């Protein structure tokens, strides 16, 4: 059974309220994980993952990004990322991570981004990478297919039962997505979309990503957004930048939402094993000290 999270509100640098959910383990946490969700979904869809991470000793935070979930609903801004677009979203996410650090001083903080959340996280690494003990990117790619390709994501899964068969082989999970009023581009129309269709490495300055930062890239091999090839290209790109610890895995036949796939237990076990091997008392810079933003 999923644990009911605590609800927080974090005011971002533009003065906008962001709704955040926190799942806390029964014992003192060994590290924190900040989950960044994808487009047209929301943070509480990661409750099952958060419960599993709690059982492994991790406190989990997940915010509803600008224009999404409770953040979008309570400000009547579903689908609207604000006047600064993607950069504003990244700064809002950074404010949440700062809250995590303030609530757990000295604890290593990891970030996990899914799909659009992985693109947010990659830009975050360029600007605030020293904040983190490690990064996990899933449902991701090196060069994004573009928002205009959304209508073609089901092409490989014909005859399709629903417009969202590309999300998962688990029909119950697809049906839950369809039934969720805070999911789907019909419910969350993109009222502003600068940079949402850029791949993980298509903007910003990669030279600012800390070389000591551990990164785990993992995709479903049948994911139409990146799949095995797009994920591998991103991992190879990170290695070419000089990062010391880059792990890549593609799961055969799995689709876009690995945490809602039929092999989700395998995926979660791999995530926990990766985190366990890297959870320390220092951040990725090795200092555990002050954090500085990059332009």
PLM segments and residue spans:
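Conserved alpha/beta-hydrolase "acid-adjacent" motif
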Residues: 224-233
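Alpha/beta-hydrolase-fold enzymes
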Residues: 112-188
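Conserved alpha/beta-hydrolase
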Residues: 45, 50-76
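Short beta-strand element of the alpha/beta-hydrolase
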Residues: 29-38
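Short beta-strand/loop motif that positions the catalytic acidic residue
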Residues: 217-219
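Catalytic active-site module of serine/aspartate enzymes centered on a nucleophile-bearing elbow/loop
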Residues: 245-295
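N-terminal cap/lid segment of alpha/beta-hydrolase-fold proteins
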Residues: 1-25
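Alpha/beta-hydrolase active-site loop
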Residues: 81-102
């Amino acid at each position: 059974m999923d644990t009911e999270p605590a609800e927080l509100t974090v005011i971002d640098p533009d003065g906008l309220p962001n709704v955040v959910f926190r799942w806390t383990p029964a014992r003192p946490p060994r590290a924190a994980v900040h989950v960044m969700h994808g487009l047209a979904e929301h943070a509480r869809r990661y409750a099952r993952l958060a419960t599993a991470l709690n059982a492994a000793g991790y406190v989990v935070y997940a915010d509803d990004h600008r224009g999404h979930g409770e953040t979008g609903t309570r400000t009547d801004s579903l689908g609207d990322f604000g006047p600064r677009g993607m950069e504003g979203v990244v700064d809002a996410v950074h404010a949440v991570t700062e809250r995590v650090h303030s609530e757990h001083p000295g604890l290593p903080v990891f970030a996990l981004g899914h799909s659009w959340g992985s693109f947010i996280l990659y830009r975050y690494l360029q600007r605030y990478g020293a904040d983190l003990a490690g990064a996990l990117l899933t449902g991701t790619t090196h060069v994004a297919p573009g928002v205009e390709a959304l209508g073609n994501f089901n092409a490989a899964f014909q005859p399709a039962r629903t417009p969202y068969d590309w999300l998962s082989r688990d029909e119950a999970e697809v049906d839950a997505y369809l039934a969720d009023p805070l999911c789907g581009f019909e419910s969350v129309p993109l009222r502003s979309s600068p940079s949402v269709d850029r791949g993980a490495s298509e903007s910003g300055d990669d030279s600012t990503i800390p070389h000591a930062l551990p990164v785990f890239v993992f995709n479903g091999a049948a994911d139409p957004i990146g799949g095995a090839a797009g994920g591998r290209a991103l991992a190879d790109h990170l290695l070419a930048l000089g990062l010391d610890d880059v792990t890549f895995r593609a799961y055969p036949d799995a689709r876009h939402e690995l945490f809602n796939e039929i092999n989700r237990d395998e995926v979660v076990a791999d995530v926990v094993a990766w985190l366990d091997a890297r959870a320390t008392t220092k951040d990725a810079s090795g200092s555990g000290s002050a954090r500085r933003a990059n332009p």
